[in-house]
Swiss-Prot record:
UniProt source species: Mus musculus (Mouse)
Pfam families xref list: EF-hand_8 (PF13833)
Residue numbers binding Ca(2+) 2: D152, D154, T156, K158, E163
Protein known as: Calpain small subunit 1
Function: Regulatory subunit of the calcium-regulated non-lysosomal thiol-protease which catalyzes limited proteolysis of substrates involved in cytoskeletal remodeling and signal transduction. Essential for embryonic development.
Binding residues for Ca(2+) 1: A109, D112, E114, E119
Modified residues (N-acetylmethionine): M1
Ranges where the EF-hand domain occurs: 96-130, 139-172, 169-204, 205-233, 234-268
CC per GO annotation: calpain complex; cytosol; plasma membrane
Residues engaged in binding Ca(2+) 4: D137, D225
Length: 268
C-alpha cells in the first residue's frame, strides 16, 4: 500500500508460506492471553480536508468522513512501528519474548518469512478458539485480506516479520481493551460501550463516525463481536496513520490525485 510505505517499514520479498506447526496455537494463545490492558476532485488532484464536500449525497458523506478523520487523527498518537532492520543486526538485541515470537513466525511463514491472508486467518481463528469469552463468527478470508492489505508496506500481498509483529502487538492490546469494556460479559461490545473502548485504543471519534462504524461493523442490535472489533481498529489505525503521514504540516487537510486515492481505497 503506497501510503503505508511512509510510516511502516518492514517485511521482505514474497513466495509461499508454511502451515500451523505443532503447538503453535497454544503458544500464540499464551502470548495473546498475556496482553496488558489499556492502552472532490477533477483535474490533477483531489483535496481532502476538514470541511464538507459540495454537491450530492456522496460528496456530503465523503466530506463528513474526512472531517471526522482529520479531527480524530490530530489526537491519535500511537507508538511508531519499528524501523526496517536486517535480521542479523537485530537478533542480538532482541528480548527473549521477541526471540520466541520470531521462532513462531518462522514456523508459520516458512522460508520466505511472509504471512499470507490465509495463514493469518488460520492463526487468528486458532487463537480465538482458546477464548470462549470472546464472541466471534471467526475471522473470514476477506477480513484477513483487508488486514494484510492495510499493513502490507511493500505490496507483496503478504506480511513480513515486522509488519506481522506490529499487527500482532496491536491485536493483543485491543483484545485486552475488548474484554475490559465488555462490562456485561456478553462476549460482545454494545453500542453504548464502544466509545469508551475506542478511546482506550487511542481513537477519539465524533458521533457521526461512531454511527457509521456501528452500521458497518455491528449487528442489527448494535453489538460488535471480536473479529469485527479487530477488523475495524486495524482499518482505523491504518487510515489515521496514512492521513497523518500526508498531513505533514498538521493542517488537517491533505491532497491526493485520483491514482493515489484509488490505491488508498481499493487495496485495503
Amino acid at each position: 500500500m503506497f501510503l503505508v510505505n511512509s510510516f511502516l517499514k518492514g517485511g521482505g520479498g514474497g513466495g509461499g508460506g508454511g502451515g500451523l506447526g505443532g503447538g503453535l496455537g497454544n503458544v500464540l494463545g499464551g502470548l495473546i492471553s498475556g496482553a496488558a490492558g489499556g492502552g472532490g476532485g477533477g483535474g490533477g488532484g483531489m483535496g481532502l480536508g476538514g470541511g464538507g464536500g459540495g454537491g450530492g449525497t456522496a460528496m456530503r458523506i465523503l466530506g463528513g468522513v474526512i472531517s471526522a478523520i482529520s479531527e480524530a487523527a490530530a489526537q491519535y498518537n500511537p507508538e511508531p512501528p519499528p524501523p526496517r532492520s536486517h535480521y542479523s543486526n537485530i537478533e542480538a538485541n532482541e528480548s527473549e519474548e521477541v526471540r520466541q515470537f520470531r521462532k513462531l513466525f518462522v514456523q508459520l511463514a516458512g522460508d520466505d518469512m511472509e504471512v499470507s491472508a490465509t495463514e493469518l486467518m488460520n492463526i487468528l481463528n486458532k487463537v480465538v478458539t482458546r477464548h470462549p469469552d470472546l464472541k466471534t463468527d471467526g475471522f473470514g478470508i476477506d477480513t484477513c485480506r483487508s488486514m494484510v492489505a492495510v499493513m502490507d508496506s511493500d505490496t507483496t500481498g503478504k506480511l513480513g516479520f515486522e509488519e506481522f509483529k506490529y499487527l500482532w502487538n496491536n491485536i493483543k492490546k485491543w483484545q485486552a481493551i475488548y474484554k475490559r469494556f465488555d462490562t456485561d460479559r456478553s462476549g460482545t461490545i454494545g453500542s453504548h460501550e464502544l466509545p469508551g473502548a475506542f478511546e482506550a485504543a487511542g481513537f477519539h471519534l465524533n458521533e457521526h463516525l461512531y454511527s457509521m462504524i456501528i452500521r458497518r461493523y455491528a449487528d442489527e442490535s448494535g453489538n460488535m463481536d471480536f473479529d469485527n472489533f479487530i477488523s475495524c481498529l486495524v482499518r482505523l489505525d491504518a487510515m489515521f496513520r496514512a492521513f497523518k503521514s500526508l498531513d505533514k504540516n498538521g493542517t488537517g487537510q491533505i491532497q491526493v490525485n485520483i491514482q493515489e486515492w484509488l490505491q488508498l481505497t481499493m487495496y485495503s
